[in-house]
From Swiss-Prot:
Homotetramer. This is Nucleoside diphosphate kinase. Its EC number is 2.7.4.6. The active site is at residue 115. The lineage of its organism: Bacteria, Thermotogati, Deinococcota, Deinococci, Thermales. It comes from Thermus thermophilus (strain ATCC 27634 / DSM 579 / HB8). Its main location: cytoplasm. The keyword Cytoplasm applies. One of its GO terms (biological process) is CTP biosynthetic process.
Length: 137
């Protein structure tokens, strides 16, 4: 069964959006295979966003993602990677359609509520970064 990694970012947790976001995924029929509230360390943030290391926004991204707790989860279901990407909406909230998570809740490109794996390969890498095998049900 296909799995993806999803993270509700500090702005989403701070604004009390966790329940609504989880409900959207559950209504879509996805199974939660793992879930935890956590504080991301500087090292984990840098590993997670390693592909952006040389970009000018990298320090701010790491600072933001470590600024408060996040909810990390693994969702499972047919076509879950692509479907979650569609449900999240465009990265920039001004481009995100109403009815998508970012379209409904994101305020800026920097604080856009949620992260989801872009590909199956990314999902496998991100799941392994955030969860030990025994944490996956």
């Amino acid at each position: 069964m296909e799995r993806t990694f999803v993270m509700i970012k500090p702005d989403g947790v701070r604004r009390g959006l966790v329940g609504e976001i989880l409900a959207r995924f559950e209504r879509k029929g996805f199974r939660i295979a793992a879930l935890k509230l956590m504080q991301i360390s500087q090292e984990l943030a840098e590993r997670h966003y390693a592909e952006h290391r040389e970009k000018p926004f990298f320090p701010g991204l790491v600072r933001f993602i470590t600024s408060g707790p996040v909810v990390a989860m693994v969702l499972e279901g047919p076509g879950v990677v692509a479907e979650v990407r569609k449900m999240m909406g465009a990265t920039h909230p001004k481009d995100a359609l109403p009815g998508t998570i970012r379209g409904d809740f994101a305020t800026t490109i920097d604080e856009n509520v949620i992260h989801g794996s872009a590909t199956l390969e990314d999902a496998q890498r991100e799941i392994a970064l955030f969860f030990r095998p025994e944490e996956l049900l």
